[in-house]
Amino acid sequence: GLFLFNKNHQAADEPQLDMSRIPAHVAIIMDGNGRWAQARHLPRVAGHKQGMQTVKKVTIAASDLGVKVLSLYAFSTENWKRPESEVSYLMDLPIRFFNTFVPDLVKHNVKVTVMGDITKLPEKTQKAVNDAMADTKDCDGMILNFALNYGARDEIKRAVQSIAQQAAAGELDPASITEDTI
């Protein structure tokens, strides 16, 4: 398996990491932070805060290892069903994350991208996300791709709606729809 290690302090008996086997794209579903906190008798938000610190470490490690794309499933469309106080905290996390971490991302040449419908996020969260993308737009190293307000069904729904609108406007022949259209 793949593991992380400190390059300068590797024990002699530890196996070497095969750099030719580093995946080009790593995707992580960030799930279980709340349960992690509850198991330690902490509030759920403490788990989300700890998760944010872990994301920072994983991002730098992935970049250092040569991963091309790191996708983090951070907030799904289903997460809106959580308690309002938890959702509010989760909406503030990107603000805190980017305010403290963008300089490190730029230093490591990491470009921030987002998939999902961020127009449904609070304005201050949208601003933090958009600022992070703008601040890292010239970086050409690893791509740090956040799935925010993302859900596969929602993505399919939005694609179908867009295609239907184009067809209704006479801009697209339904018979010409291919996988590439979607």
Where are these regions (language model features)?
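Flexible, compositionally biased loop and terminal segments
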Residues: 1-182
